[in-house]
From Swiss-Prot:
Residues 121-138 have a biased composition (Basic and acidic residues). This is Large ribosomal subunit protein uL24z. Belongs to the universal ribosomal protein uL24 family. NCBIfam families: rplX_A_E. One of its GO terms (molecular function) is structural constituent of ribosome. GO terms for cellular component: cytosol; cytosolic large ribosomal subunit; cytosolic ribosome; nucleolus; nucleus; plant-type vacuole. It comes from Arabidopsis thaliana (Mouse-ear cress).
């Protein structure tokens, strides 16, 4: 159900917004979830992916493979990961494009801007959890299973 009357649910308009998005908008759209370890450490679910992050592929042909992000190709909505390549007919090797939603970030490349973003997102999430008051940890759930 739509809660905000100013947000469209038109398929045509959403597709147009997606495919004509600027590079800065694509950065946010091309976010990847964090691994469970990082999620518990930072209290943040996902982050915009960037070069030099270490990721693990969780869907598709290359499932289970890990590597460092070599390039974020925003125009094609894909990322290139080291050692994920294929050989062309003429013998040259090229990177295979992987969608950012099909990977989990296992190690973040942190600088001051990224640290401030993590703190800001964690602060907002903590405020929402406090307001809601129904946040369960994985330990709470496992205690109830037995």
């Amino acid at each position: 159900m739509k809660y905000n009357p100013r947000v469209t649910s038109s398929r045509r308009k959403n597709r147009k917004a997606h495919f004509t998005a600027s590079s800065s908008e694509r950065r946010v759209i091309m976010s990847s979830p964090l691994s469970t370890d990082l999620r518990q450490k930072y209290n943040v679910r996902s982050m915009p992916i960037r070069k030099d992050d270490e990721v693990q592929i969780v869907r598709g042909t290359y499932k289970g493979r890990e590597g460092k992000v070599v390039q974020v190709y925003r125009r094609k909505w894909v990322i290139h990961i080291e050692r994920i390549t294929r050989e062309k007919v003429n013998g040259t090797t090229v990177n295979v494009g992987i969608q950012p939603s099909k990977v989990v970030i296992t190690k973040l490349r942190l600088d001051k801007d990224r640290k401030s973003l993590l703190e800001r997102k964690a602060k907002g999430r903590a405020a929402a959890d406090k307001e809601k008051g129904t946040k369960f940890t994985s330990e709470d759930v496992m205690q109830n299973v037995d």
